From Swiss-Prot:
This protein's record includes keyword Translocase: no
Gene: TRIP4
Keyword Cell membrane: no
Region of interest (Mediates interaction with UFL1), residue spans: 300-400
Region (Mediates interaction with DDRGK1): 200-300
Zinc finger (C4-type): 171-187
UniProt protein name: Activating signal cointegrator 1
Function noted in UniProt: Transcription coactivator which associates with nuclear receptors, transcriptional coactivators including EP300, CREBBP and NCOA1, and basal transcription factors like TBP and TFIIA to facilitate nuclear receptors-mediated transcription. May thereby play an important role in establishing distinct coactivator complexes under different cellular conditions. Plays a role in thyroid hormone receptor and estrogen receptor transactivation. Also involved in androgen receptor transactivation. Plays a pivotal role in the transactivation of NF-kappa-B, SRF and AP1.
Residue numbers carrying Phosphoserine: 276, 341
Cross-link position per record: Glycyl lysine isopeptide (Lys-Gly) (interchain with G-Cter in UFM1): 324-325, 334, 367
């Protein structure tokens, strides 16, 4: 039948090949066309050719329909041909004879009679496509054994899908696909048969089955061999138990601190678990509205503190107008009403809420926090513009006692205040509060370069330490620059290197403000540089540092505070300045 079909279908095969090559530009061999024509269903032919042509629009659809029409016509001619029917009958008879030979061979095998039988050579069909290969394999398997189908959703089907690789490999099946070995007692990892018994792949702790654990507990030669076998890969894995390592002091301290925090957190969770019913109890629609103490993670002390603070603010807000204080100034003809303290409260953070957030509510107050219990005197603050202190000669004890008695405070308070005024030089160099002073050019650049050693002002400042220098927006004239350079050449010498440019409206660098002296004190203590300034008050500056990149900035009068971001960037851009002389 195959030979006759091939002979009768040769024109159709030739026609299909020519159409595919000329019309559609597909270089298709005749074997593929013969395979297409050997398909028994017209729908399968239409689907196959549609995939081959990648669509059925226009000429493609006409070619497919014409091919199916010619295929059906050719198939009818083959059926009507009596020669083909004879071929079919011969094939059926040959199949029956081969079956009878197989049955006879089995019977002879049972009776243990070895009779030589004629075996026809296997006629394997020509494999041209993957479909033919699958069909040939299916035919060969059907002769050998019966196919058994397994449901993939059953236990047996899941076992067939699971693949067990040789050796120990990480697996995340959690004992669902492979057999369970055990759980790691340190990290809790579920170890399956794929990972196998041995060191945990996460923490390195030994994990084995119950049978192996029983053998290890016997402490015999067999247990020693088993332990050596199980722990043989711990060196290669690079994971060793933490308890066996020698820790450095800072590592041990860090582990202890972490353990203490973990224990505190555990106690906190247990405490909240015990009191969860009382804390999560809802009264009416209380949870629908905001309340400061509604957070379930607050302790009893924090909750009571918040409730007390809320009552104070409510009384302050809804206080009677009769208790409001009004000041009548007859001399200035003004009526001053006391400001609402709520405005000040909303302009800053609440100390109670901030203490709860930082976890410092239960800590005792430090010495600086107890401002209401004992007076600390006047602390150094650049924002406090007070009268400058008078020069006191410490050699004369009588005058010192007289000055102490003349003051309104006691001797003990004055001595305590005097101690607060003492500032350590190392502390001044290490502390940088970001305070800045605006100076006109070209004096600002000379001050940052170290050529100008003092700065004169008409007001006193208690600030000591680092002081940033910002140039004002006013640009200097060339005449001012030349006159100032000539002056400092006379004061400092001819080998002074002056800056090439004098930028304005930017942050130049910083100096260390050592002292602020009056003109009289300045001439007494620094007679060699007294010619540089004749202002009422003189700032003594040392350690000048210039910035590599100047930041554009807008100045303010007197001493003012820099923006935090500009301050951080300025500290990173400082360079050490060489001395001018």
């Amino acid at each position: 039948m195959a030979v006759a079909g091939a002979v009768s279908g040769e024109p159709l095969v030739h026609w299909c090949t020519q159409q595919l090559r000329k019309t559609f530009g597909l270089d298709v061999s005749e074997e593929i066309i013969q395979y297409v024509l050997s398909i028994e269903s017209a729908e399968e032919i239409r689907e196959y050719v549609t995939d081959l042509l990648q669509g059925n629009e226009g000429k493609k659809g006409q070619f497919i329909e014409e091919l199916i029409t010619k295929w059906q016509k050719n198939d009818q001619e083959l059926i009507s041909d009596p020669l083909q029917q004879c071929f079919k009958k011969d094939e059926i008879l040959d199949g029956q004879k081969s079956g009878d030979h197989l049955k006879r061979g089995r019977k002879k095998g049972r009776n243990r009679q070895e009779v030589p039988a004629f075996t026809e050579p296997d006629t394997t069909a020509e494999v041209k496509t993957p479909f033919d290969l699958a069909k040939a394999q299916e035919n060969s398997n059907s002769v050998k054994k019966k196919t058994k189908f397994v449901n993939l959703y059953t236990r047996e089907g899941q076992d067939r899908l699971a693949v067990l690789l040789p050796g120990r490999h990480p697996c995340d099946c959690l004992g669902q696909k492979h057999k369970l070995i055990n759980n790691c007692l340190i990290c809790g990892r579920i170890v399956c048969e794929q990972e196998g018994s041995g060191p945990c792949l996460f923490c390195g702790t030994l994990v084995c089955t119950h049978e192996e654990q029983d053998i290890l507990q016997r402490d015999s030669n067999k247990s020693q061999k088993l332990l050596k076998k199980l722990m043989s890969g711990v060196e290669n894995s690079g994971k060793v138990d933490i308890s066996t390592k020698d820790l450095l002091p800072h590592q041990e301290l860090r582990i202890k601190s972490g353990l203490e925090k973990a224990i505190k957190h555990k106690d906190k969770l247990l405490e909240f678990d015990r009191t969860s019913i009382r804390r999560t109890q809802v009264i009416d629609d209380e949870s629908d509205y905001f309340a400061s103490d509604s957070n379930q993670w607050l302790s009893k002390l924090e909750r009571e503190t918040l409730q007390k603070r809320e009552e104070e603010l409510r009384e302050l807000r809804h206080a009677s107008r009769l208790s409001k204080k009004v000041t009548i100034d007859f001399a200035g003809r003004k009526i001053l009403e006391e400001e609402n303290s709520l405005a000040e409260y909303h302009s800053r953070l609440d100390e109670t809420i901030q203490a709860i957030a930082n976890g410092t509510l239960n800590q005792p107050l430090t010495k600086l926090d107890r401002s209401s219990e004992e007076p600390l005197g006047v602390l150094v603050n650049p924002n406090m513009y007070q009268s400058p202190p008078q020069w006191v000669d410490h050699t004369g004890a009588a005058s010192q006692k007289k000055a102490f008695r003349s003051s309104g405070f006691g001797l003990e308070f004055n001595s305590f205040q005097h101690q607060l005024r003492i500032q350590d030089q190392e502390f001044q160099e290490g502390f940088d509060g970001g305070w800045c002073l605006s100076v006109h050019q070209p004096w600002a650049s000379l001050l940052v370069r170290g050529i100008k050693r003092v700065e004169g002002r008409s007001w006193y400042t208690p600030h000591r330490g680092r002081l940033w220098i910002a140039a004002t927006a006013k640009k200097p004239s060339p005449q001012e620059v030349s006159e100032l350079q000539a002056t400092y050449r006379l004061l400092r010498g001819k080998d002074v290197e002056f800056p090439n440019d004098y930028p304005s409206g930017c942050l130049l660098g910083c100096v260390d403000l050592i002292d602020c002296l009056s003109q009289k004190q300045f001439k007494e203590q620094f007679p060699d540089i007294s010619q540089e300034s004749d202002s009422p008050f003189v700032f003594i500056c040392k350690n000048p540092q210039e910035m590599v990149v100047k930041f554009p900035i807008k100045g303010n009068p007197k001493i003012w505070k820099l923006d935090s971001k500009i301050h951080q960037g300025a500290k990173k851009g400082l360079m050490k300045q060489n001395k001018a002389v």
